[in-house]
A protein has these predicted regions:
Chain A
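Membrane-water interface segments at the C-terminal ends of transmembrane alpha-helices
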Residues: 9-43, 52-163, 187, 191-212, ...
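Short, charged juxtamembrane terminal tails flanking transmembrane helices
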Residues: 2-5, 263-269
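Glycine/proline-centered hinge or cleavage motifs at structural transition points of membrane proteins
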Residues: 176-178, 190
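Short hydrophobic, aromatic-rich alpha-helical segments embedded in or entering the lipid bilayer
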Residues: 221-234
Length: 269, 260
């Protein structure tokens, strides 16, 4: 059957020139994980997991990463649509701007956020003066820092999906009298749903692991802004085993969520 | 291939000869040590950045043929790096606890000696706009405070000083090291931070320091030690001796440290 024929055709024809670097690449990515697993203090694991700070940090991480992803979806999907579907002057510049957080060291991103949303920042001063809202050192600040770093992943994935999608469906909808908004919600969105999901998953994973921008912009306070990566970093200062345990939890949660999502929604048609 | 190896050997020989010359020439200078050459790698606490950079330059001048390279970071991170086999000659820690981590793992050579001590002050923006005069003022409503996390030496000292003062403080943030806490004051995001006196001395144009009596109960001792696997043991010993000499003490004192 085609199912059994496909892998055989795939495995036998791999040239050594590709196979060797591929295996090396895999080892390079997998070995550090194996190192964590080998050095984990398995015997004291239950006590360490039961420590009060661990669950607090984990809950905060899951909540903030999820809210940040929602924020990215709300703003990122329209942005991706704009980049993919509308010809406007300076589109290349806008696209380059969107990818800036990808290359910016997250700590610098955190400082940049402080300069804008901080107490003395352009927007931050207005927010504080008008609404009494201060974002630094708050949970909302964590969400903001995570969204800043993670949104490019979503925008790039969704823009790619939009460009790959067949525009004839949208044109057909237009000829049938659908307005552009209706076309977007009833034709475009369902068409690129798998791309949006993939982008959202990437975005969520990036937000979950965010460290530099978070500690710089939102600071570190248990229960309010101390997410798992921050807890790992501070545990490293005193107790490497605790840091390994925290990392394993983060690893397990993200692998579980990514695997579950992959199986359900992101399988290619 | 062979030619290249030969050339390398010649260069190596020449370098050996040169360093021999350096050692001979140094006898004329005011060198406090005996024939020290080569690179000395020093792992030092972040709060020593300014003073040790100065001391390193002075040491190189006093010992021609030597080069001092530094790795400045949080003491606990440095202790971890040393215990994981980092090739360091000297370790200078901001707290005895981190030094103990290294000596307990059998990576010290001899006994650590305390060469300096540091005290906490309250760093406030230039001019002290909130009029902060002591630890109790930090709990006033509307005053945002950054402290170090208790896992790092400055955080442990802050916790102790607050306990001595009987002040219950909820900080806006617990920073990962003392320089990060100071940066939050410089950026204007907090109204005060508990940092070392030396950090305030190093940033005179950005912040003012407010002294408080309870800091005397939470003094940080800085121990220094030559490491067991030091690639340049003679250089390491000479550097430690230099830090503890009159010249070294002068630099440390100017930076705001107290020397025993």
């Amino acid at each position: 059957m085609s199912v059994s024929a496909a892998p055989r055709r795939g495995t036998l024809r791999v040239p050594l020139g590709l196979l060797v670097p591929a295996v090396l690449g895999l080892a390079f990515l997998a070995l550090p994980l194996a190192g964590l697993l080998l050095r984990a203090p398995w015997s004291t694991l239950p006590q360490r997991l039961a420590q009060p700070g661990v669950l607090t940090a984990l809950r905060l991480s899951l909540q903030t990463a999820t809210i940040a992803t929602a924020l990215c979806l709300l703003l990122g999907v329209p942005l991706a649509w704009l980049l993919a579907r509308v010809e406007f002057p300076g589109r290349r510049v806008v696209r380059a701007l969107v990818t800036v957080p990808l290359v910016l060291p997250p700590v610098v991103g955190g400082v940049a956020l402080l300069l804008v949303f901080g107490r003395r920042g352009i927007v931050g001063r207005w927010l504080a003066g008008t609404f009494g809202i201060t974002l630094p050192f708050s949970t909302a600040g964590v969400v903001l820092a995570e969204a800043f770093v993670a949104m490019p992943f979503l925008v790039i994935a969704v823009e790619g999906a939009l460009r790959g999608a067949d525009t004839r469906y949208e044109e057909a909808a237009a000829t049938l009298g659908a307005r552009r908004w209706t076309t977007f919600t009833h034709v475009t969105l369902p068409l690129v749903a798998p791309g949006i999901t993939a982008g959202a998953v990437l975005c969520w994973a990036r937000a979950l692991g965010e460290f530099g921008a978070t500690i710089t912009f939102a600071g570190n306070f248990p229960g309010r802004t101390q997410t798992m990566p921050l807890a790992v970093y501070l545990a490293l200062e005193t107790d490497m085993k605790a840091a390994i345990v925290l990392s394993l939890i983060l690893l397990t949660v993200s692998v579980a969520v990514l695997a579950a999502l992959r199986d359900r929604w992101i399988t290619s048609p | 291939m062979t030619a290249r190896w030969t050339r390398t050997a010649v260069v190596a020989l020449a370098l050996t000869a040169l360093s021999g010359c350096g050692g001979g020439a140094k006898a004329n200078g005011p060198a406090p040590s005996h024939g020290v050459t080569g690179t000395v790698t020093v792992f030092a606490a972040a709060s020593l950045t300014e003073s040790f950079t100065r001391i390193g330059k002075d040491f190189q001048a006093a010992n021609p043929g030597t080069k001092v390279t530094f790795n400045f970071a949080g003491s606990s991170a440095l202790a971890t790096q040393i215990n994981q086999g980092a090739p360091a000659d000297v370790f200078a820690s901001a707290a005895p606890a981190n030094m103990k981590t290294v000596t307990d793992a059998g990576n010290g050579d001899g006994t650590p000696v305390v060469f300096a001590s540091n005290q906490l002050v309250i760093a406030v923006p230039k001019g002290n706009p909130q009029g902060i005069a002591g630890l109790a003022d930090l709990t006033r409503p509307g005053v945002k405070v950054a402290v170090c996390a208790v896992q790092v030496p400055c955080g442990a000292a802050a916790k102790k000083a607050l306990a001595v003062a009987g002040v219950k403080l909820t900080p806006a943030t617990e920073e990962q090291d003392v320089k990060a806490a100071l940066a939050k004051v410089k950026l204007g995001e907090v109204d005060a931070a508990l940092v070392y006196r030396t950090d305030v001395t190093a940033a005179p144009s950005d912040v003012d320091g407010v002294q408080f009596p309870e800091s005397a109960q939470a003094v940080n001792d800085y121990p220094i030690e030559v490491l067991k696997n030091a690639p340049n043991k003679a250089g390491a010993q000479a550097f430690v001796a230099y830090v503890r000499s009159g010249e070294g003490r002068a630099v440390l004192t100017a930076a705001g440290f107290r020397c025993p």
